[in-house]
């Protein structure tokens, strides 16, 4: 955010974690993957239902529930569709109503609590690509950007109603999501991310399917504030993270993981 100097973080690690932990286990495959054409996964639904891609229109005339059967197949087999939803362009192009699935889980971009100061680091590459390069130069220079320290806050939503009516997202899937959020950086370390980690997960659990309070009111109860005397935060311990649990609405429980 240029105007405030706040940093943003985008999600990808959850899918990577689930794929690593489940390793091809039935029902936990990942739909959105690097360098894998989406229509390859889409065709699996056609194969499962015995439909030739060129004859989808004829199959739809014979099966009134074809859209639902395809959607259910994709949700059952791919964890990220069941969780986050997906836009499956193969089915959209074939004029099927299952091409866009709304997922019960939505996560916002994470934003830094305080302004950040990215630093540019110069690195030296000692390896040479070709023999011709070796004759001309000894090393190559490069740049890398790092953020020495920042505390980020992300907010998310889980719709029990959509989970039940649309994708079949289950309690077991939810537990796996919590596990992924807490541990996703532990299986995918990188020099640029340093010691990046999820420090706490705060969950508001409602006792009704449609919820007992608006999400924004619950998010406002969570505060991340610098401790007294700290001008430049350099560690998680420089912050005090609190939840105003006394102000929780009836039927809402706060779980801190």
Residue ranges of model-derived segments:
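RAMP-family (Cas7-like) RNA-binding scaffold and associated basic/acidic loop-rich RNA-contact surfaces
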Residues: 22-257
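Single conserved hydrophobic/aromatic residue that forms the stacking wall/gate
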Residues: 1-6, 10
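Short active-site loop/helix that positions an aromatic residue
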Residues: 12-20
